Structure formats: C-alpha cells, structure tokens
C-alpha cells in the first residue's frame, strides 16, 4: 500500500505501484475509513475524484486511477466529488515524508525532503494566504532559496508544482465554505486567499466546471447539521478523522484540565466548548469568539460550531481546531510502530491547543503540582487577568470591517455586542489573558494568586518573548530552535519544553526523557541512569514518540495524575 500512497511516486510508475493500486482498490471497495485522506480515487469514466469512503457505487477497477494528493488528481483534470467532498478528508501525505513502512519520518530527513515539507506547510497555512504569500518569488524568499530550486524540489517530492498545490488547497477550502456556510461568495473568495471575486470565479469554474453558487443547493439542505443544531449564531462545519479515535479519552483529558469560565466539557453530549481570541494576519486587533466541537457517535466526524465573530479568521480557526483535536493523525502508521509495546491504546491521540502561548503558560503553571492545583491556578489567572468575553454579532462583513477591513469589502456599520449565546453554556465568560497583559502583570498580584516567583518569571519571560517575536509557539515552527529558545528562558527546562513541543508545536517525536512516570512505565526507574535508558528505549518508536508518551502515561493512568510525579526539576538542563 505504501507505494501507492507515497507522495513522491506516481500511481503508474511500476509493477510495485500496480500492486499498491490494487490494495487501494480493495480499500475503496470496503470504504475503509482508515485510508481516508491517504489517497484519492479518480474515475476516468466520470472525470470525478473521490475519497476512499465515498458511498457511491464502486467504479470498475479499469476506470480507477489513484493519487496521494488531491492536487495531483486535479492536475490530471479530475473534479472533486460533490457527495464525499474531498475537502473534508483528514490531511494525508502532505504531513510528512513516507518511509517504506508507511510511517512519516520527521526526525531524520534529507535537506530536500525538509525543504519540500516546509514549502507545503507554508502553502497550507491560511494566515499566509492573506499575508503576502501569492507568488513563487515570495515562497522562495521565505524559504531562503531560488525559485527554480524550490520548484524543482517541490515537484520531485509532491508530484505537482507549488502553485498547483496551493491552488487546489484554496479551491477546496472555498468548496467547503460554499457548501457548509451561507457566507457571501465575496467573503469566501477572500478567506480562501483570492485577491478578487473575478479571479476566484475564473479559477473555480476553470477547475471544477461549476459555478460557485451551485454549491449553495447543498448548503440549503442543512450542511450536515445535527439534531438541535442551528447555524443562526454560528458557522457550522464538519471535519473528518481516521479511525480508531478514543473520543472518551480525549474528552476526559480536556475535562480534567478545563479552566472554569473559559471552557467546558460535556461527556454526555460529547462536546467541548471554549472561548478563543485570535488575531488574523494584518489585523489591528484580535477577534473574540467561541468554538464548540461535537463528536458524532458512530461516525468518523466532528461537527464544529464557530461563532460568526471569528468568521474573518475562519480557515485559520479550522486549522487550529484540527490540530487541537489531532484529527489528522494516521493511526495505522502510528499503531504499526507502537501497538506491540502499548496494546489496547489504538485510538489514543495527542491533545493539542488552540493557542500556543496559552498552552505554554498552563504548562508552567502545572510544574511540580497536581493537575487539580494547576486548574485552580489557571482559573485564578483567568478570573484576574482574562478579558471579559463578549461575542460580536451583526453582519459578517461588519465584523471583518472592525478588525481588518479590505477596501473592496468594507461594511457600513459596526457589529453590536452581546454575551455568549445561551444555547451554549452559561458561565463561559472569560478569555485567556494575552501576552501583553501577562507581561505587564504585577508580580505581587501574581503571588497573591498562588503563583510562586520562579513561575512568575517564567510566565512573564514567555510573554515578553512572544511579544518581541523571538518565540513562535504554533505548528510548523522550527522545533529545535523553539525548544532552545524555551529552555533559554528562566524556569523552563527540558520537560516543559518537550511538553510544549508535544502539544503546541504538534511535534510527533517529542520525548521528555527525564519524566519520572515515564521511567516507571518503561520499567527503567531502578537503572543507574533512567533518563538515558528511557532515551535509548524510545529510539524504536521514532518518529511517533509523542504518541508513545501518551500511551505510556495511560498505562499508569497518569494522563490526569499529579504532575509532580512526572516532571523533573524545572531548572534541569539537557546534558
């Protein structure tokens, strides 16, 4: 199977890929959700390409072509299926390079592979679409190489040109917004990275042979809303993931760590709700809103409700939600490497975050104390320094105009303000404190909240670094540079840095080798140098050591246990 889904190998290369295509066809016939997003099936008799889970009648084998990327299928002249909707598939091959066993290799890569992945991450990032990334010269400049070099490396690795990859990414984003929301076409064009409605219409019709407004028929039928859900106070979209997924474990993790006034988990309804502040690229001030994720039972689907006030940053919010819930993980590849050592943990995911700075502060607050105590400190911090939450209402264009108005789409009136919709949860009325707020916080007041001086210094150093732009805490940031920058700050050692890398940077190979509970789970606690023994033991789990850590903690039932059992002294430095 790996030959057919390798991103740098065409589906007609050799006899090996023919056999792999046969395996793809078998997955297609059985609608195996484990392969969703790992390949797309193009049907020559219809000109349409589909996800492996598409519910239409299975096409004949001789009419099928298989592509690792949607961009490759579109480059070959195929259009996305309107029923299975390829834009909803979990991210697949573009998340990394593939080894012979089908696993993504993050830790050991050649320079060309790293460059191709960096380019893809830039093209995937919604913030870049509205922040000047609109040409090959800009992409090459950000990567520090020539246009010719980045084009050659990208095409060799991904099988399509950078511009074709980017165009497909934008058009599929637009397709989802057109289908699932009632946003004006002009706003969809803007959010999808197009400079004008005319360019958007030309690209959409040219690629899909379909007018953008034609997709409104699908949206008018409900857009996939569940029982009791309404799109009146929110944008409602769906997201897919590959099974297995331990929903109960993920929700329990969030419930154990939730901060009162800012987030809430309902285990019965399988929902997690929280507030969010986000600053779109080029905006003068942040947008404030709320998000809710509801796991649909007996389905590999999450319904995402996003307040209309976050509409101007919708693609960015969607990307963060997927990372927060770890929806793009590939359980098949991960389990192939880990299941022998961690049986019964097939569905465990690594919880992410919606805000890297928030996660870093919460990690510092949790050093050397129990999770319950860390929650108490977090609740006090949010109550004292968190900004009161008000949701912006009114027209979507007015909300956008208030933050980062494009001249062509400027709205005449500002939005009104009101509280969180009562259909959600009362009591969610605060936002997590911003970096500027915590950087200016009075140490005496922080002390009155129960935060010791060492943690105060660490939190304020984090805030200053984020404000100065010397520390980036989001997926795609340079892991080595970020971890070095973190450990250069007072009060932050290897354990905290690895924990931040694991959850905020979404680095799948993070491994806090000094973790005491990890030593116990691996049975190395009595060795002379347990940290070195744990590091040596972990080598066979690369590049999925973050998942191994979560599975080891679950073995001891310490995912929600006292952090003081897990974290070594924060002053410790790597050898």
Please identify what each model-predicted range represents.
Residues 1-575:
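HhH-family (HhH-GPD) DNA N-glycosylase catalytic core used in base-excision repair
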């Amino acid at each position: 199977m790996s030959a057919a889904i390798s991103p740098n190998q065409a589906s007609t290369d050799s006899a090996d890929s023919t056999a792999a295509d046969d395996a793809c066809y078998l997955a297609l016939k059985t609608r195996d959700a484990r392969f969703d997003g790992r390949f797309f099936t193009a049907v020559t008799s219809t000109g349409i390409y589909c996800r492996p889970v598409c519910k239409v009648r299975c096409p004949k084998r001789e009419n099928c072509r298989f592509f690792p990327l949607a961009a490759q299928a579109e480059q070959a002249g195929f259009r996305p299926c309107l029923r299975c909707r390829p834009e909803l598939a979990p991210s697949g091959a573009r998340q990394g390079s593939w080894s012979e066993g089908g696993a993504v290799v993050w830790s050991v890569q050649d320079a060309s592979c790293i460059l191709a992945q960096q380019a893809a991450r830039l093209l995937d990032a919604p913030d870049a679409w509205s922040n000047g990334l609109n040409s090959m010269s800009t992409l090459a400049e950000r990567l520090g190489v020539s246009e010719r070099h980045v084009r050659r490396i990208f095409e060799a690795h991904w099988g399509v040109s950078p511009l074709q990859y980017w165009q497909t990414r934008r058009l599929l984003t637009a397709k989802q917004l057109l289908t699932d929301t009632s946003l004006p076409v002009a706003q969809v064009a803007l959010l999808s990275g197009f400079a004008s409605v005319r360019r958007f219409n030309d690209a959409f019709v040219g690629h899909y042979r379909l007018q953008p407004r034609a997709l409104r028929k699908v949206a008018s039928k409900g857009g996939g809303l569940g029982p009791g859900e309404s799109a009146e106070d929110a944008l409602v979209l769906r997201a897919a993931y590959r099974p297995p997924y331990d929903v109960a474990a993920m929700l329990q993790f969030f419930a154990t760590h939730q901060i009162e006034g800012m987030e809430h988990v309902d285990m019965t309804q399988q929902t997690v709700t929280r507030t969010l502040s986000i600053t779109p690229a080029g905006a003068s001030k942040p947008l404030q809103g709320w998000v809710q994720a509801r796991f649909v039972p007996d389905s590999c689907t999450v319904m995402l409700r996003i307040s209309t006030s976050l509409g101007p940053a919708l693609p960015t919010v969607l990307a963060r939600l997927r990372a927060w819930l770890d929806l793009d993980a590939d359980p098949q590849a991960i389990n192939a490497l880990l299941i022998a050592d961690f049986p019964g943990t097939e569905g465990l995911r690594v919880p992410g975050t919606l805000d890297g700075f928030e996660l870093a502060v919460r990690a510092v607050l949790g050093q050397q104390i129990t999770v319950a105590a860390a929650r108490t400190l977090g609740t006090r911090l949010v109550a004292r320094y968190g900004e009161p939450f008000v949701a912006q209402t009114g027209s979507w264009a007015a909300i956008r105009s208030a933050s980062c108005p494009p001249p062509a789409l400027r709205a005449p009136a500002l939005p009104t303000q009101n509280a969180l919709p009562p259909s959600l949860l009362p009591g969610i009325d605060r936002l997590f404190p911003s970096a500027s707020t915590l950087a200016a916080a009075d140490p005496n007041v922080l002390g009155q909240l129960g935060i010791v001086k060492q943690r105060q210094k660490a939190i304020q150093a984090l805030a200053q670094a984020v404000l100065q732009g010397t520390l980036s805490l989001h997926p795609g940031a340079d892991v080595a540079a970020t971890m070095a920058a973190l450990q250069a700050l007072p009060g932050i050692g290897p354990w905290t840095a690895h924990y931040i890398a694991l959850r905020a940077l979404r680095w799948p190979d993070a491994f806090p080798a000094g973790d005491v509970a990890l030593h116990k789970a691996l049975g190395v606690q009595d060795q002379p140098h347990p940290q070195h023994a744990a590091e040596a033991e972990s080598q066979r789990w690369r590049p999925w050591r973050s998942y191994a850590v979560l599975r080891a903690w679950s073995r001891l039932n310490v995912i929600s246990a006292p952090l003081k059992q897990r974290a070594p002294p924060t002053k410790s430095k790597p050898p």
